[in-house]
Structures are given as C-alpha cells and as structure tokens.
A protein has these predicted regions:
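An acidic, Gly/Ser/Thr/Pro-rich helix-cap/linker signature
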Residues: 2-10, 16, 20-89, 94, ...
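Catalytic and substrate-binding regions of cell-wall glycan-acting enzymes that process beta-1,4-linked
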Residues: 29-60, 109, 116-119, 123, ...
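Second-shell loop/turn segments in exported
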Residues: 63-71, 83-84, 105-114, 131-142, ...
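Solvent-exposed, polar/charged alpha-helical surfaces in well-ordered, non-transmembrane soluble domains
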Residues: 72, 76-79, 83, 95, ...
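Short, functionally critical alpha-helical segments immediately adjacent to catalytic or ligand/cofactor-binding
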Residues: 90-107, 166-171
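Substrate-binding/active-site groove segments that recognize
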Residues: 112-134, 146-149, 153
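Non-catalytic, structured segments within soluble enzyme domains
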Residues: 149, 157-175
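Surface beta-strand/loop "capping" patches
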Residues: 218-227
C-alpha cells in the first residue's frame, strides 16, 4: 500500500524532532538511552536519573584511556575473581570494585594504609583472616585478598539487603549507611543517598559506570533494580 504524503511528512517531522532531543553520542562513547539488543530494562526502571546517566558518560569519557588499559590486563585477575565469586554465589560483576579501588594493582597502598587490589584496611583484613606483618601482607596477594573481599561483601549484602548499600558501606563504613537509613527513614539507596558522604555516593556511581563500561546496561539490572 503506498504511503500517503501527509503521513510521510508527519513521520519525517517526528523523526527530526527526536534528533533534536536525543543527546549527541560521540563514536565509541556509551549511549545510555539506546543500547542495541537491550531494551528489556530501562534506565528509569533502574532509577538512574538524568544526573546519574550524565555522571556515567562523563566518568567514562574522562577515564577511557585508563579503563582501556585495565581491560587489556584484566584477563588473569578477573579469572581469579570470577572463580571466587562464583564459589560464594556472588555476582561476578563485583570484580569491578577492584578496578575502582586500585586498577587491579596488587601493590597499591593508600595514604591511610589500605592496601592491595581491594584496598583493605589492616584491621578489616585481620578480621577477615588475612595475615599482615613486616615480612608478608596477604592483602597484596590477589587470590587471598579476593577471597576476603568476597566474604566481606557477602556479609555487607546480608546486612543491608541490597548491593548499592553494600558498596556504600564497603567505601564509607557500616555506620555511615546506618546513619543515612536513620535520617531518611528508608532502606532504598536512591532515597537515602543524600545522607551518605559525598565520597560514598560517588563511589557507587563509579561502580555503575565501570560495570557499564565493561559489560553494558543489562549487567546493571541486579544492582539497581529495587535498590
């Protein structure tokens, strides 16, 4: 059936209008509004508002070179983390926290004394069974520190009930999350985030951005839906 001229003009007009409102996406930059072959879960369903989406775009754009370098060297460490997290029945995407913490560097040490790929503090590491002495620091052993981090993250998830709160606690401590819950009267991350330290809020968004960079939008569903 031939297309009527008025219908064609209307279709073209709508299409042109859409071009005006959809943000321009640079080649190679993630498009969080339209991802090919993945329309099942919208960003709105995952509570990722425009401000969060813009953070993800900006973060990946600013850190693309560094993220690409980590990606190139990630096969061996990610094989370890995948094995450990599968053994503990945890999402393998938790491995991207180590990207945020240290760029997967086993010898990384922070100014406050956190060390290893998971940047564990000495007291936390010892509670998790890692040995630290002048001769040996198991926080810097990828397999042992990953096992400790997995157990810690599993405990945090059991304590707070969702992953985004667990990430905030991993970064800023459980007391900061409990304070945010008390002040907001909510256990939902997106409702209480305003009461969290700015560093923890940024940390959670960095995880979302890094996870998206490595795996795409569908990988975020488990972490953001219902959080």
């Amino acid at each position: 059936m031939p297309v009527r001229k008025t219908a064609l003009i209307k279709t073209l007009s709508v299409g042109f209008a859409l071009l005006l409102i959809i943000p321009c996406v640079t080649a190679g930059e993630p498009d969080l509004l339209r991802e090919e072959n993945d329309y099942r879960v919208s960003m709105e369903q995952m509570h990722l508002n425009q401000k969060t989406r813009q953070f993800i775009r900006t973060y990946i754009r600013a850190n693309r070179e560094e993220l690409d370098e980590v990606k190139e060297k990630s096969r061996s460490p990610f094989a370890i983390t995948d094995s450990v997290f599968n053994a503990y029945e945890l999402p393998v995407q938790l491995k991207y926290l180590a990207v945020i913490e240290s760029d997967l560097k086993t010898k990384a040490v922070s100014r406050v004394g956190a060390a290893g790929p998971w940047q564990l503090m000495p007291e936390t590491a010892r509670l998790l069974g890692l040995k630290i002495s002048s001769h040996k620091d198991e926080r810097k052993l990828y397999d042992k520190s990953t096992d400790a981090a997995a157990r810690y993250l599993k405990d945090l998830h059991a304590e707070f009930g969702n992953w985004l709160l667990a990430f905030a606690a991993y970064n800023g401590g459980e007391s900061a999350v409990y304070h945010a819950i008390h002040m907001s009267g909510s256990h939902h991350y997106w409702q209480l985030q305003g009461y969290l330290p700015a560093e923890s809020r940024t940390y959670v968004k960095k995880f979302i951005a890094t996870c998206y960079f490595f795996e795409g939008r569908s990988s975020l569903k488990e972490f953001c839906m219902g959080s």
